[in-house]
Amino acid sequence: MGQKIHPLGFRLGITQQHRSTWFAPRKLYVSWIHEERQLRDYLKTRLADAGVANVQLTRQSDRIEVEIHTACPGAIVGRTGQGLEILREDIQKRLPKVRRVIVHVVEIANPDAQAVLIGGIIAKQLEERIPFRRAVRQAVQRAMRAPGVEGIKIEVSGRLNGAEIARSEWVREGRVPLHTLRADVDYCDCTAQTIYGVLGIKVWIFRGEIRPVRQVLAPGT
């Protein structure tokens, strides 16, 4: 079960949270979904070099909050903060029905423990024709040096190093318990566009277990 299902969706409500928080009337539900998809695609393209790991959206009837978790906040905010205002205005133009747009930028304290950022580094190296084993080995070493990381697994699929027959290879170091629901497992899948075709990259990072806090009641209560 844990080997097949999506690691993040499997843990929603336990160690993972929804990346969108809103409720829409029945008539607006479809249009809001399309607007969110367009907004996320725009942010993915606009902030491709800003080290964005996650985007949280909170929406009400006439207001939307965009929380961007990034390893390079300066690339978004700019020196004087003007970049953040330009980004907010661009989002406002794409959402004309929303009266107020609020953008928050949150700096990631431990970027090497984020699967999205590790996967992006591997994809960039593969597109620069670096041998996939070297790229994967460097990514594993980089992640295992990050505080809190207890294990990592990386799988690369496709025409590796230009081979005629596509195959899959994976590397794992440490523990990556996919069946344990309380395990804090971060996951991402991305692609690398090479001259030989598209390579698929999957990254699992295990950051320890999150155990619920039990309240001990005093005698007589």
From Swiss-Prot:
Cystine pairs: none
Domain KH type-2: 39-109
Keyword Membrane: no
Gene3D superfamilies: 3.30.300.20, Ribosomal protein S3, C-terminal domain (3.30.1140.32)
Keywords, in A-Z order: Chloroplast, Plastid, Ribonucleoprotein, Ribosomal protein, RNA-binding, rRNA-binding
Molecular function GO terms recorded: rRNA binding; structural constituent of ribosome
Domain of life, source organism: Eukaryota
GO cellular component annotations of the record: chloroplast; cytosolic small ribosomal subunit
Family named by the database record: Belongs to the universal ribosomal protein uS3 family.
Identification of the protein by name: Small ribosomal subunit protein uS3c
Organism: Nephroselmis olivacea
